[in-house]
Amino acid sequence: SILIFDEAHLMPQDYLQPCLQAVAYITRYLHSEAVFLTATMPDFEKLIKEYALPDSKIVKLIKDTSMFAEFQKCRYRYIGGISSSELLSRCREYPSSLIIVNKKATARELYQECGGKRYHLSTYMTSYDRKRILKEIRQELKQLEADYPEYKDVPEDRRITIISTSLIEAGVDLDVYTVFRERTGLDSILQAGGRCNREGKRKTADVFIFDRTEETRQAVSDDKASLTKGLLKKYEDISDVRCIEEYYSRLYFMKVDDIQKNTMHQICSDLASIPFKEYAEKFEFIDSRQVSLVVPRDAQSEKLVETMKYTKTGNARKLQNYTCSVTRKELEDLIRQHAADDYGTGIYCLTNKDYYDEYKGVLFEAPDYFL
């Protein structure tokens, strides 16, 4: 068999060693091959030799990287601290802009502040609404390009601003004129760059990396963001292979204790001694602090929820399209306001439509009504 790992850099650091060891075992003892794909490749050769099977055979499929620069579609520029109003004003200078921020609350605040033609995307919105908005964005971008092929003299009322969380960075096919990315890990910033001049129709385009002046120092001092800041000062081009390699080398060095605490030790060569149950219980790709919340949006979803209420069983798969994500505290607030219930099934649903907006997502206070 051939196993393809897309976005391989997203393997969780806490369980990196068991992941790599599992891949190494599969390739050796089950006579398979593994292909790692990513635009931001860590030094997996070094990591596999250190944390998995040292004598594993590793081959780089692309040995000559000298032509990479020819395919570079954007340049990355760090602009430092900027206020929300300055950021939005600067975005409106371009035919189409994408702002990507680290927090859902920030995305919503910017959307509410933003004027003109604007779009908002976050997991506060259901998958149903995110797909609908993305379809509308693609249509608008396509029409904008048709009307202004050179993007010259685009009137203000036709300029597009998209405000999103990191959900737009992978698997979303959008091509905008300019991207503004709040400082975070280098891997995320380079993924954000993939939405800028995606089709390479212009010689170059800009991805601006910024810090929000409204954020506290603590909010932007996580390890990945701090590493990125140092690399932005050191490298003129942060998409350079050397920069990416240094980023991961330093990141994994900083996280060595996290990696080693869940190591599948070499003494576990006997399958019976591998703690499968412990790994299964602790291994998480999805943040456990987030909870799914079903928001009925049409007759089909309402019928599914009604069935769930009376049968006390829920079909999570069928409801997936109508599901958004909130924190446990946010869910508790909704329950306290009698706006959410699980009807004894463990699948929580929004019970009051006033607590949801199709463009903003879940609201945590119902709108005020005046008679």
Regions found by a protein language model. Give the residues of each.
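Short glycine-/polar-rich loops that comprise or flank the Walker A/P-loop
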Residues: S1, L30-S32, A69-C74, G116-K117, ...
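Conserved catalytic network of the ASCE P-loop NTPase/AAA+ motor domain
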Residues: S1, Y25-H31, R92, K142-E156, ...
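Conserved helicase ATPase motor motifs in RecA-like P-loop NTPase domains
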Residues: I2, E7-L47
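Hydrophobic residues in beta-strands of the RecA-like P-loop NTPase core, especially within AAA+ ATPase
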Residues: I4-F5, V101, S164
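Interdomain hinge/linker at the junction between the two RecA-like core domains of SF2 helicases
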Residues: Y25, T40-E93
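C-terminal helicase lobe and adjacent C-terminal extensions/tails of nucleic-acid helicase motors
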Residues: T27, S85-Y94, A105, E109-Q112, ...
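Conserved two-lobed SF2 helicase motor
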Residues: E150-E169, R181
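SF2 helicase motor core recognition
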Residues: I160-V176, Q191-E199
